[in-house]
Amino acid sequence: MRHFDSMEILNELLKFQSITPDDDGAFNYISMILNDFEEINIDKNGVKNVIFRKTFGPGVHICFAGHIDVVKPGIGWDSDPFDPLQKDGFIYARGAQDMKSAVASMICAVSGVQNFNGTISLLLTSDEEGDAVFGTREALKFLQSRGELPDFAVVGEPTCETVFGDTIKVGRRGSINGILRINGIQGHVAYPNKCVNPVHILASKFANFAGHDFDNGNDFFEPSKLVVVDIRGGMQVCNVTPSDVSVMFNVRNSNLTDANDIKNFINDLYKDCDFDLNLKVSSNPFLTDKNSKIVQKLSQSVQKISGVCPVFTTGGGTSDARYFAEFNVDVAEFGVINDRLHAVNERVSVNEVQKLTEIYKDLIENF
């Protein structure tokens, strides 16, 4: 079996225009490299999920996970976003950081395993950047139905902030979206006594609403803050008061706050008003015990290869790691620096990719 270098793999992966949920042939390329692994295809509603798996012994099952899809490149690039350009120690292309670099490192690491007292798998999806409804979660549901869920998982999201090796994600905040609509009575602006202006009602308590912290956070989570993202009301005319005004907001919640806490807060704040509230839980917070074997072993490998002692955090947006937590799989996330995510001229350091590959290899060898 020919050995594939992680940089060679990355260079090829970056050529695929795998905009969600189209893999554009990337899975065929990966299948060619991992041709001695069992391959399980789980396709649903146009989303492709592939599990590559090899069992070496009766021990634990470690799953490396990631996504092959990327967001649209947009305009303004200095080079073709799907024709990787290597320059000054970096590779420029869409998906370089998020997250084909980690996928390439994972493929290289697992393909070279000769001895391991357990099972090694690689779970990849073509829908993480989109709705992610039929992606990683669907693959895990399939494994659960067969009693084959992994014991531990590593997700290759780009976690590092300023220096490679500085951050391991051991959890993520949840995400709750909400729309608050204050109802009033429309009327002529010259006769305010005959109207009920919902904007005035909203404004009277808005300082206590916008930016509200539902908790004080803890060692791993920042406070759960209500962030207003949009306000709409009226007909954009100067002589009619609106019949209602709507506020769209989001709460990235810790494990100390849930949807009921948000509902109770708003019900109390606007208890004397006519309003409607709609809340949607997009994802739940999770936290992997810092003493979990996957966290400790990953931390040791990061320190050994990068020379940096990583901190354990839960910041940033949501990721597919939450689905592993949902299925009670201990999960940690580690990848390259994340300073160009979804940006024009996205790039990744060649040195980081090579070190990331060594970290994944070391984790397997010493688990």
Curated annotation (Swiss-Prot):
Pathway, per record: Amino-acid biosynthesis; L-lysine biosynthesis via DAP pathway; LL-2,6-diaminopimelate from (S)-tetrahydrodipicolinate (succinylase route): step 3/3
PROSITE patterns: ARGE_DAPE_CPG2_2 (PS00759)
Cofactor(s) this protein requires: Zn(2+); Co(2+)
Pfam families documented for this protein: M20_dimer, Peptidase_M20
Sequence positions that bind Zn(2+) 1: 67, 98, 157
Enzyme Commission number, as recorded: 3.5.1.18
Active site: 69, 128
Keywords per UniProt: Amino-acid biosynthesis, Cobalt, Diaminopimelate biosynthesis, Hydrolase, Lysine biosynthesis, Metal-binding, Zinc
Residues annotated to bind Zn(2+) 2: 98, 129, 342
Cofactor remark: Binds 2 Zn(2+) or Co(2+) ions per subunit.
Enzyme class: hydrolase
GO biological process: diaminopimelate biosynthetic process; L-arginine biosynthetic process; lysine biosynthetic process via diaminopimelate
Domain of life: Bacteria
GO molecular-function terms, A-Z: acetylornithine deacetylase activity; metal ion binding; succinyl-diaminopimelate desuccinylase activity
Catalysed conversion reaction: N-succinyl-(2S,6S)-2,6-diaminopimelate + H2O = (2S,6S)-2,6-diaminopimelate + succinate
The protein's role, per its UniProt record: Catalyzes the hydrolysis of N-succinyl-L,L-diaminopimelic acid (SDAP), forming succinate and LL-2,6-diaminopimelate (DAP), an intermediate involved in the bacterial biosynthesis of lysine and meso-diaminopimelic acid, an essential component of bacterial cell walls.
PANTHER family: ACETYLORNITHINE DEACETYLASE, N-ACETYL-L-CITRULLINE DEACETYLASE
NCBIfam families in the cross-refs: dapE_proteo, PRK13009.1
Assembly and interaction partners: Homodimer.
Family, as annotated: Belongs to the peptidase M20A family. DapE subfamily.
Protein name as it appears in the record: Succinyl-diaminopimelate desuccinylase
Species whose genome carries this gene: Campylobacter hominis (strain ATCC BAA-381 / DSM 21671 / CCUG 45161 / LMG 19568 / NCTC 13146 / CH001A)
